[in-house]
């Protein structure tokens, strides 16, 4: 059971997953909000609520969520994005906390892409530390176009739909700057791991 929980966040295409993987190599359990969000949106009451609000156009023929269609809708419209978050986020938060507390390890990391947007510690009071992966906006843009095949316009919308770098940095206890050098991420993870282990067992 992990009583010490670190929230890991950063903008889209910032390298959160790469940093999380470095912590996993060190034996730290990582709970991924994106994975939990997909589980929450499987057929059931949350998906029913999504379909009731957005219509059947966000469903595939087999009744599962058409993630691409929904993503396009919510990135294009702030009100629709907020509506989706109101439907899904309470369930995601509950499951994240449950999974983090149940994790076996020296401490647990919970990767939460929209931590700043959700209100930081005010919304996640059970986080002991907040770790932000920071990346220049130009590099985010480039990664989205290369990694996800996003157009320049969609990449712009995806970045501006999220909190600003300044807002994310304002909630950070620790910051890792990711310029795409894996060795630097690995070194940062080892340094922070030693600190978090000490904090988890004072």
Swiss-Prot record:
Domain DPCK: 5-202
Domain of life: Bacteria
Keyword annotations: ATP-binding, Coenzyme A biosynthesis, Cytoplasm, Kinase, Nucleotide-binding, Transferase
Gene3D superfamilies, per the entry: P-loop containing nucleotide triphosphate hydrolases
Known pathway: Cofactor biosynthesis; coenzyme A biosynthesis; CoA from (R)-pantothenate: step 5/5
The protein's Enzyme Commission number: 2.7.1.24
Predominant location: cytoplasm
GO biological process: coenzyme A biosynthetic process
Keyword check for ATP-binding: yes
Coiled-coil regions listed: none
Catalyses which reaction(s): 3'-dephospho-CoA + ATP = ADP + CoA + H(+)
Keyword Kinase: yes
UniProt GO cellular component terms: cytoplasm
Pfam families to which the protein is assigned, alphabetical: CoaE (PF01121)
MF GO annotations: ATP binding; dephospho-CoA kinase activity
Chain residues that bind ATP: 13-18
Location(s), subcellular: Cytoplasm
Physiological role: Catalyzes the phosphorylation of the 3'-hydroxyl group of dephosphocoenzyme A to form coenzyme A.
Family to which the UniProt record says this protein belongs: Belongs to the CoaE family.
Record-given protein name: Dephospho-CoA kinase
Source organism per UniProt: Xanthomonas axonopodis pv. citri (strain 306)
Taxonomic lineage from the root: Bacteria, Pseudomonadati, Pseudomonadota, Gammaproteobacteria, Lysobacterales
